[in-house]
Amino acid sequence: MKKIIMTGGGTAGHVTPNLALVPELKKLGYEIKYIGSIEGIERKIIEKEGIEYFPISSGKLRRYFDLKNFSDPFKVLKGVFQAKKIIKREKPDIVFSKGGFVTVPVVIAAHLNKIPVIAHESDITPGLANKLATPYCTRVCVTFPESVKHIKGDKAVLTGTPIRRELLEGNKLEGIKLCGFKDNKPILLIIGGSLGSKIINEIVRKNLDNILSKFNIIHICGKSNLDENLENRKGYAQFEYVNEELPDLMKASDLVISRAGANVIYELLALKKPNLLIPLSKKSSRGDQILNAASFEKSGYSLVLKEEELEDKNLMKKLNYLYENRNVYINNMSKSKMDNGVKNITELIKKYTK
């Protein structure tokens, strides 16, 4: 039996793509172990899946001045020795790294143990952890065609991003039942990210009458963002957060408004959902969502509305255009070869564990 050690953490976005690979890797006969941080979000998620978890020390990597920048390198160094010991004991055939600060010591340790490493980068430009880890990687899987030039050493492989299988197995009727919709209006799903989006919530509710004249609305608005005054509004179903229900709600929707994080837009691509992307502005991000959205717009998969241009008339104009041209977007997405990241990545893993 082949053995793989996976690593990635710091945020859910560095863990869920790993989970998407797990069922296929198990089917292929791989024994799976996981190295993560001591107190990171990844520990709870991974242990819930019944995967053996090895915690190591790791310092956070920062691009800005902080007093912890003087102590954290020693935590990373400690993590390298801990990971090296784990890898030497477990003897994996390969290491798969999804990024996040905890992966740097693991990748270095694998390199020191002469174990091949495949990393994955979700965004167009690599994050700091993957930048530091790339010299020690055998290959780096990238999500966007534009990413290839940003990976040094001719190591980039265009694979797309892995999508959880259960997300593709939703039930449309269950989604409609959950929302209580009784008519046949097209359904608009609005996703503001795991924490919701204040600006998107406000513009949607401000234009609720106009939008409801044409669509039923599923609004995932984020924690503490429910509006009690809209609880019984016909055609409007609001949720703070969804988990198991998401596949059914996705399946039920005809159009989607979303932020432009790499994971969610590739989920929309896999599901062939016409979408309007409203990327985070540079005021509140490093600009990666703007680049992600531009790439999908260029490929004909998405329509984009800049946050700075998020006004009443622009929103309705874009929604109407998207719905009228929905089949064009569906056809474009159907031609993509980047909607099967799980297969593309597991094939690469197989190649380096023969």
From Swiss-Prot:
One of its GO terms (cellular component) is plasma membrane. Pfam families: Glyco_tran_28_C, Glyco_transf_28. It is a peripheral membrane protein. It is found in: Cell membrane. Its EC number is 2.4.1.227. Pathway: Cell wall biogenesis; peptidoglycan biosynthesis. One of its GO terms (biological process) is lipid glycosylation. Belongs to the glycosyltransferase 28 family. MurG subfamily. This is UDP-N-acetylglucosamine--N-acetylmuramyl-(pentapeptide) pyrophosphoryl-undecaprenol N-acetylglucosamine transferase. It comes from Clostridium botulinum (strain Kyoto / Type A2).
